[in-house]
Every structure is written in structure tokens, then in C-alpha cells.
């Protein structure tokens, strides 16, 4: 480039249009009339500075004088010593406080508006360029004013928040200083004696934490901000750094470490020193902060007090879950339970009372947790009233001793022949029927009379309105008759006595009335309130009178129920049908049960797929007091469970699952207790007790329950009946595998094994027995149990000889001259020598003679000579017992 450079030539050098270069020169405050004018070096540098400022770069170039800096940052360091209390001693800590302040210079362009270049009216193009430049400058100025206003509002908002925080900080510091003084006073006073009163968690939480500078409260001006700033003014808010006093910082650390043990504080202190570096890094802020922590960490080593926790526990909880709630190790929880005498593992379940005791022993509190949300929702469903109660049919339960004619009476009323088809001629499950009579509909429940079906009869008495007690006129009052009276009284149900079999020649109805007087059942003719009806189920005599008595009693009771709305009731019997699945016989007590309803039944739920009455018809709905069979449940419910109809399947499923979880936890608690009881029992009884494992499958739930109770009751000190599994339905492959594993006897009551189960049973030699009568089950189990007991060896004395004289023999030694005073003495049997009724020797005969002849036996009132083998101390007056050992089969 030559010394004289024109605007046109400069535009060619920088590859910029001439018009744009003229605009840039005008923006830099230099006026030129045309592109042929000369541009000096000073004007070039001024244009370069303008362009740099426009594009956000510093106006610095080689060969020019550096302008004054726009920002100046001052750093100040101040060292001070802090004295920290460490128990009885005091420790001095060096603290370095750093302060940084930045001053920003405001450009003159914001205070002085650049003068407008004169406009030459002759040059129209220059006028247009200057007009555009003026508009651009005005827009930039308006934008800068808007941004300045936004910054001003933001600064005012930050200032307002800062003042509020300072006011709150003053209040917190007052509280902190007061509480810390109390803590330090207590700490100094307790340096000799142990801590007597723990600091509560609430008080610890009340301590304010030291406010540290946050990014929002301390905006720092970094080097990148200096380089990238567009000239805007950024003020640093006051109060962005809060100087923390030594006393407040040490008190904060002391409060934060109250829950740590001495070992944990030492370990934390060492980790802090390691992370912060050594003393050579103490000049840095992080190293200084960590050095303060590590120097004060050992200053408050005090005995700590355990935190008292309050946890909510339901009816049951596992040991591991309770330990987790109390923030303890599971092993420590097990040790605490062992000390209390409860031997459990971490996976076992304990009840609520045990959890309360062990938690109080460990210094914690336990409250009862409510886990019945779904049950409450279900209760709200049942409490809703759907309509006015209207009269309903009575529910009558037929009870009495076995073979007294209960089912025969129902057969005559229903015109059926059920008793003929029952196994053994006895009823072994509850039968539910409803009969339409001239006097209205009556629902009958036929209960078993065998002693094993006590729980069945108890359930029948609870859900009934009237109990008809059937007593045979020729047999009188029997044990199950007395039991039926007790069930009726326990349920508060009126009693009607039906004296059956009056057509027999040996019938004595008066005897029945007299015997029932001992059970406080007084007939009306004797001044009581119990109706007695004499009848015969064979001839039909008196049956109408019984129906009249039932109708009269029902009118007196004024039985009513709501017949619309959601149905509720009770399960009478349940079974597992191979083709239909779980089947439950239910008695509706309120509302109307319809097909498609969702219901909860114990731990099972489902949707009613079909309804069947006792004759196999499918009614559209079941009203109160009507028994029906329900199909569609998820499992076989227990007899006696209540059912409730709900709106949706979700609620039914939640309630059933919650009940199943509670039952499982309760079963775990019971089984754990039973295991410990079994261990202690085995320790006391030794190894003599035999165990008979049984696997029982039955057709209905009621029979299964009765079988289990009757068989378990056979256990005694010599043998224990252990029922490993019970279930409703046929014997499956899994049942057979369980029997093989546990070496159990399989009992099928009115059920059979399928093909796969039979194959496993035959291959492994499992004892499988089928029954249809409960008497046979009990007798067979007794025989099997007796076989396990083996035989018992008994000793039976067959003869006694009295020693009258003693002779000496060179061959046998001492020979006793005896008189047989009882029984017979045989040579092949063992003997005992008694002196003053005390056994002095037990052995065998070496010689038995009479008149110097060897004989095999000597009978009563006969003299003989007895030589005792290997015993020569026989004396006059001794007694010699001859006995034999016999084997006796042991029975239950």
C-alpha cells in the first residue's frame, strides 16, 4: 500500500463495497465527500477500533496505545486466628478470609450522545445512509434502555430479597447463639459426668444452618464474562458473601455431629483431611475449609444417645423388616429376641405384641398400623341400606344324634330319597334345601350327626333362625343330642324338639321329655317354652304338626330382610368340581344375588358365572333365606366364610388379596411357634414318639375339616398324627409327589386319584386308601398308627415258690427245697429271687427236680428242689418267682 490510500482502494483491499465502507466511516464519526478522498493511518485505526467495538472485541492493536481498562478487580486476603473449644482444652485455628471486588468503567458513549454529522443536501445518497444509521442508532439506544430497565428491576428484586434474608438471618442467628450457648454450657458441665439428657431431634432441627453463598446470591465476574461482555454494566449485589464467625461455625459442626460416635467422627475427620490435601494446600479455599473441619472434628467426642424412633407395625411383621424400620442390623434384632426367649430367624414373622416388646427393649416406640383400607371400603358397601325390610322365609336347621332320622324327615317333607343314597346311610356334609309348603317357603339345613362334625353343626346353628332337634323315641338323648342343645343356646336360636320313630314298638316319647329336662329343655306341657312334636318320618304322622310349629315360631320371630341391593350371606359348603371348578353353596341373608355379580368370599373373589338350586335348576336370582350353588370363584372358600357383593372386580380382588396376606402372615407366626413347641416337646419326650404323616383330600370343605380334626385328635404321647396337607378335589400329581417326599399316607374321602398321580403312587409304593364313611377313616388310621407303635414286651408271673430249706450239692451247689404256693414253676422260664420282697437276683433255673427226678414243671402245693444257676446265696424264707415275657400289640 502507498502512503496515499483512497477510500476506493481501501475498499478493494478489504474486499468491501465502497458504499458499505463509507457507512462504516460515517458510523466511526468521520465524514468523507467521495470515494476518491484519501484515508490517513489515524483514520484507519479509528475505523478499526470502531469495527472492533461494534463486533464485541477489544480496541487494541499493534502499534497503538492501549486504552484504559474497562474493569478492575481487587483481591484482598486477611489472616486471623480462631480459638475453638475442644473439651477442656482450646485449639487455635488459622483462618484466611478472601475478598474480591470488581469495578466496572462506564463507557462515555452512554453519557454523551455522539454529534450528528452534518448532512450535505447536495448528496442524496449520503443523506439516505445517514438516515439509516440514525434509525439503527435509535433502535440500539431503545434496546439498551429496555435492557437497563430490566436489569434495574432485577437488581431491585434481588435487593429486596437480600434485605428479607438478612432480617431472617438475624433472627436465626439470635436463636442459634442462644441454643449454642446452652449446648456449650451443657457440654462443659458434662465433661466430667456422663450425658444425662439427650438433645431432642426437634431441638437439633430448630438450629439454623449457616447461610453459605449460593450461585443466585453471589454472581461472580469471570474472565470469560470480561471477554464476552458487550459493554453492559453488571453490578455485584451487596452482601453476596457472608462471613461466618468462628463460634457459629464450630457450634454448627457440633450440632451436625451429635449423632456420630467417636470412631465415626475420627474416620470422617481423616477422610476430610485426605480429600482436602495436606498443609501445603492450605492456601486454597477448599483446603482451608477442610482443615477447619478436621481440626474441630475431634473436639466434641462425647457419649451419644440413641435416637428414639417411632414406627408403625401391623398385626405381623418379619424380623428383617422390623430391623430396617428401626435402623438396626438384623443380627442385632435377632440377638435381642433371643435374650427375650424368642428364637427366630430374620425371615420369620413375629406378631405385633412381640414387636412392641422387643422395640421397647431397644428403646423405641411402636404404634399399630392400620392396614384395613380395603376392608373399610367393603364395610361401607355392606352398611348401605338399599330398601325397606320385608318378611322373609325362615331358615331351619335339623340337628340331632346320628341315625335318629334327620335326613329321613327331610326326605318325607321334600318327597325325595336322599338318605338311601348316602354312604353308610349317614349324612357327612351340610345339605341345604328350600321347600314350598302350604304354609310358605321354608329353607332347611341338614347337618351331620357324627361326633366328628361338631364344627359343621356349630356353623349351622349360627346361620339359622330355628333349630329342630330330632330325638329318636326308642333311643333317647345321646351325646350329640346334648351337643345340639348347647349349639342352639350358644347361637340364641329357639328350639323345637321332634320326637321321631314313634311308630316303633319300643318308642317311649315320655322318656325323651324326661331326659331333656336334665338339659334344661322343658316341654310346654311341663310349663316350659319348648314345643315337642311326635312324628314318624316313615308313616308321615306328625310331619304337618311340625311344619305348623315352625310357621308359628317364624311368625313370633318376625323375620325380615332387605330383598333389593347388594347381596350378603354365608358359605354353607364348598367343593371342587372337575368340570365346573370351585363350587360354593351359599345362603343369601340380605339383598339379591344375581348372575354377573362380583363378590368377595373369604380369601377368594370372582364373578358369578351361574346359579344352581338344590335340584339343578338355574334361577335368575336368589333372594334372602334361599340356598344356591355359586360358580365362578377363584378358589374353594372355607365353610362358614361370609360373602359380600361389590361394585367392581378391582375392589373384590384387593380385599381378597389383603385377607390372604393377613392369613399367610398369621399362619407363619403360628407355624413358627408350633415348630418351637415341637422342638421343646421332642426334647422332653425323647425319640420314642412315632410320627404318622397324612395327606387328606375330600370332596367338600366341611368333610375335610371334620376329618382333619378327628384324625389329629388321635395323637398321644406315643404317636403324633401330622396332617401335612389338606385339600378339596381329586388327588393330583403334586399331591402324590408331596406324599412321596414326606412318606405320608394318602387318604381320599369320596375322591379318586388321576392317572398321573396313580402312576407316581404305584412307582414309589405310596400307601393310598379310599373311603366314603368317616367311621372307616378313623378306624383305618388307628390301625396304621398301631402298626407304627410296634409291640410291647410285658412280663407275667406264672408261679411263686417259697424256700423251706437249703441243701448243698457237689454238682449244683446250693439247692433250695421249695413249696409251690402259687401258679406253676417251669424249667424253661426265667426266675427272680426275692428276699424281704426285694429282688436280689434274676436269672434262670439250672435244675428242677421232684423226688430226684428231673421234671419240666411243678404245680401249686407241690414240693420240689430248685437249683439256681450261678447263684449260691439262697436262704430259707426267700421267694422264687417264675415269669415269662409276652408280646402285646400296642393300640391307640
UniProtKB/Swiss-Prot annotation:
Membrane-traversing stretches: none
Any Pfam family the entry gives: EF-G_D2
Keywords: Cytoplasm, GTP-binding, Initiation factor, Nucleotide-binding, Protein biosynthesis
Molecular function terms from GO: GTP binding; GTPase activity; guanosine tetraphosphate binding; translation initiation factor activity
Listed InterPro entries: DNA-bd_dom_put_sf (IPR009061), EF-G-like_DII (IPR053905), EFTu-like_2 (IPR004161), IF2_assoc_dom_bac (IPR013575), IF2_II (IPR044145), IF2_N (IPR006847), P-loop_NTPase (IPR027417), Small_GTP-bd (IPR005225)
Protein name in UniProt: Translation initiation factor IF-2
Positions contributing to GTP binding: 400-407, 446-450, 500-503
Subcellular location: Cytoplasm
Organism lineage: Bacteria, Pseudomonadati, Pseudomonadota, Gammaproteobacteria, Lysobacterales
GO cellular component: cytosol
Highest taxon listed in the record's lineage: Bacteria
PROSITE patterns tied to this protein: G_TR_2 (PS51722), IF2 (PS01176)
Function: One of the essential components for the initiation of protein synthesis. Protects formylmethionyl-tRNA from spontaneous hydrolysis and promotes its binding to the 30S ribosomal subunits. Also involved in the hydrolysis of GTP during the formation of the 70S ribosomal complex.
Low complexity composition-biased segments: 207-219
Organism of derivation: Xylella fastidiosa (strain M12)
Coiled coil location: none
Family of the protein in this entry: Belongs to the TRAFAC class translation factor GTPase superfamily. Classic translation factor GTPase family. IF-2 subfamily.
Nucleotide-binding as UniProt keyword: yes
Domain tr-type G span(s) in chain numbering: 391-560
Stretches for region Disordered: 144-176, 189-298
Amino acid at each position: 500500500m502507498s502512503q496515499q490510500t483512497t477510500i476506493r482502494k481501501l475498499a478493494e483491499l478489504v474486499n468491501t463495497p465502497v458504499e458499505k465502507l463509507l457507512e462504516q466511516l460515517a458510523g466511526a464519526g468521520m465524514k468523507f465527500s467521495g470515494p476518491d478522498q484519501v484515508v490517513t493511518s489515524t483514520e484507519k485505526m479509528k475505523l478499526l477500533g470502531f469495527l472492533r467495538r461494534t463486533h464485541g472485541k477489544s480496541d487494541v492493536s499493534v502499534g497503538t496505545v492501549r486504552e484504559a481498562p474497562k474493569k478492575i478487580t481487587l483481591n484482598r486476603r486477611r489472616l486471623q486466628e480462631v480459638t475453638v473449644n475442644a473439651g477442656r482444652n482450646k485449639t487455635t485455628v488459622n483462618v484466611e478470609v478472601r475478598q474480591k471486588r470488581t469495578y466496572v468503567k462506564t463507557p462515555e458513549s452512554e453519557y454523551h450522545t455522539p454529534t450528528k454529522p452534518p448532512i450535505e443536501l447536495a448528496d442524496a445518497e449520503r443523506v439516505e445512509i445517514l438516515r439509516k444509521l440514525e434509525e439503527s442508532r435509535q433502535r440500539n439506544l431503545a434496546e439498551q434502555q429496555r435492557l437497563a430497565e430490566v436489569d434495574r428491576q432485577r437488581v431491585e428484586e434481588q435487593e429486596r430479597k437480600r434485605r428479607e434474608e438478612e432480617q431472617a438471618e438475624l433472627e436465626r442467628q439470635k436463636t442459634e447463639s442462644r441454643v449454642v450457648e446452652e449446648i456449650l454450657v451443657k457440654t462443659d458441665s458434662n465433661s466430667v459426668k456422663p450425658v444425662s439428657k439427650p438433645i431432642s431431634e426437634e431441638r437439633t432441627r430448630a438450629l439454623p444452618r449457616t447461610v453459605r453463598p449460593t450461585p443466585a446470591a453471589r454472581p461472580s465476574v469471570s474472565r470469560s464474562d470480561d471477554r464476552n461482555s458487550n459493554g453492559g454494566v453488571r453490578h455485584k449485589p451487596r452482601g453476596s458473601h457472608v462471613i461466618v464467625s468462628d463460634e457459629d461455625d464450630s457450634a454448627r459442626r457440633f450440632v451436625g455431629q451429635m449423632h456420630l460416635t467417636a470412631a465415626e467422627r475420627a474416620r470422617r475427620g481423616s477422610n476430610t483431611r485426605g480429600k482436602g490435601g495436606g498443609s501445603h494446600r492450605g492456601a486454597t479455599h477448599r483446603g482451608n475449609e477442610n482443615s477447619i473441619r478436621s481440626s474441630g472434628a475431634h473436639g466434641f467426642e462425647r457419649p451419644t444417645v440413641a435416637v428414639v424412633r417411632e414406627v408403625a407395625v401391623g398385626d405381623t411383621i418379619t424380623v428383617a423388616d422390623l430391623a430396617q424400620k428401626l435402623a438396626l442390623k438384623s443380627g442385632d434384632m435377632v440377638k435381642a429376641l433371643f435374650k427375650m426367649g424368642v428364637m427366630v430367624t430374620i425371615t420369620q414373622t413375629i406378631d405385633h405384641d412381640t414387636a412392641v416388646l422387643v422395640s421397647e427393649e431397644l428403646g423405641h416406640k411402636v404404634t399399630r398400623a392400620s392396614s384395613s383400607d380395603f376392608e373399610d371400603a367393603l364395610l361401607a358397601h355392606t352398611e348401605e341400606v338399599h330398601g325397606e325390610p320385608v318378611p322373609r322365609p325362615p331358615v331351619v336347621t335339623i340337628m340331632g344324634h346320628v341315625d335318629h332320622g334327620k335326613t329321613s324327615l327331610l326326605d318325607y317333607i321334600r318327597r325325595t330319597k336322599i338318605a338311601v343314597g348316602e354312604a353308610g346311610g349317614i349324612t357327612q356334609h351340610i345339605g341345604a334345601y328350600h321347600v314350598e309348603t302350604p304354609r310358605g317357603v321354608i329353607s332347611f339345613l341338614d347337618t351331620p350327626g357324627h361326633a366328628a362334625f361338631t364344627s359343621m353343626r356349630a356353623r349351622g346353628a349360627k346361620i339359622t333362625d330355628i333349630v329342630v332337634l330330632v330325638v329318636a323315641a326308642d333311643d333317647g338323648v345321646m351325646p350329640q343330642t346334648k351337643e345340639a342343645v348347647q349349639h342352639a343356646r350358644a347361637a340364641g336360636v329357639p328350639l323345637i324338639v321332634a320326637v321321631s320313630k314313634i311308630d316303633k314298638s319300643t318308642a317311649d316319647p315320655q322318656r325323651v321329655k324326661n331326659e331333656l329336662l336334665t338339659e334344661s329343655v322343658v316341654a310346654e306341657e311341663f310349663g316350659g317354652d319348648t314345643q315337642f312334636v311326635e312324628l314318624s318320618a316313615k308313616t308321615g304322622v306328625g310331619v304337618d304338626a311340625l311344619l305348623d310349629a315352625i310357621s308359628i315360631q317364624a311368625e313370633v320371630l318376625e323375620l325380615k330382610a332387605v330383598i333389593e341391593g347388594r347381596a350378603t350371606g354365608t358359605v354353607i359348603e364348598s367343593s371342587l368340581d372337575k368340570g365346573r371348578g370351585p363350587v360354593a353353596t351359599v345362603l343369601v341373608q340380605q339383598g339379591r344375588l344375581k348372575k354377573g355379580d362380583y363378590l368377595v368370599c373369604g380369601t377368594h373373589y370372582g364373578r358369578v358365572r351361574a346359579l344352581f338350586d338344590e335340584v339343578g335348576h338355574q334361577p335368575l336370582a336368589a333372594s334372602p333365606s334361599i340356598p344356591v350353588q355359586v360358580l365362578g370363584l377363584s378358589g374353594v372358600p372355607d365353610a362358614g366364610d361370609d360373602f359380600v357383593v361389590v361394585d367392581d372386580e378391582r375392589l373384590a380382588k384387593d380385599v381378597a388379596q389383603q385377607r390372604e396376606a393377613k392369613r399367610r402372615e398369621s399362619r407363619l407366626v403360628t407355624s413358627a411357634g408350633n415348630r418351637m413347641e415341637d422342638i421343646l416337646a421332642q426334647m422332653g419326650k425323647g425319640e420314642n414318639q412315632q410320627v404318622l404323616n397324612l395327606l387328606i383330600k375330600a370332596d367338600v370343605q366341611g368333610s375335610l375339616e371334620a376329618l382333619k380334626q378327628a384324625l389329629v385328635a388321635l395323637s398321644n404321647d406315643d404317636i403324633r398324627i401330622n396332617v401335612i396337607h389338606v385339600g378339596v378335589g381329586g388327588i393330583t400329581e403334586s399331591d402324590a409327589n408331596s406324599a412321596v417326599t414326606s412318606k405320608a399316607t394318602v387318604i381320599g374321602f369320596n375322591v379318586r386319584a388321576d392317572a398321573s398321580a396313580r402312576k407316581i403312587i404305584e412307582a414309589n409304593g405310596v400307601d393310598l386308601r379310599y373311603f366314603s364313611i368317616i367311621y372307616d377313616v378313623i378306624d383305618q388310621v388307628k390301625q396304621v398308627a398301631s402298626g407304627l407303635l410296634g409291640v410291647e414286651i410285658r412280663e407275667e408271673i406264672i408261679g411263686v415258690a417259697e424256700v423251706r430249706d437249703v441243701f448243698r450239692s457237689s454238682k449244683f451247689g446250693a439247692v433250695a427245697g421249695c413249696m409251690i404256693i402259687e401258679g406253676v414253676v417251669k424249667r424253661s422260664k426265667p426266675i427272680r429271687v426275692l428276699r424281704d420282697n426285694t429282688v436280689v437276683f434274676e436269672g434262670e433255673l439250672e435244675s428242677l427236680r421232684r423226688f430226684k427226678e428231673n421234671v419240666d414243671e411243678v404245680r401249686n402245693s407241690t414240693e420240689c428242689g430248685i437249683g439256681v444257676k450261678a447263684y449260691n446265696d439262697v436262704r430259707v424264707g426267700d421267694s422264687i418267682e417264675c415269669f415269662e415275657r409276652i408280646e402285646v400289640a400296642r393300640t391307640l
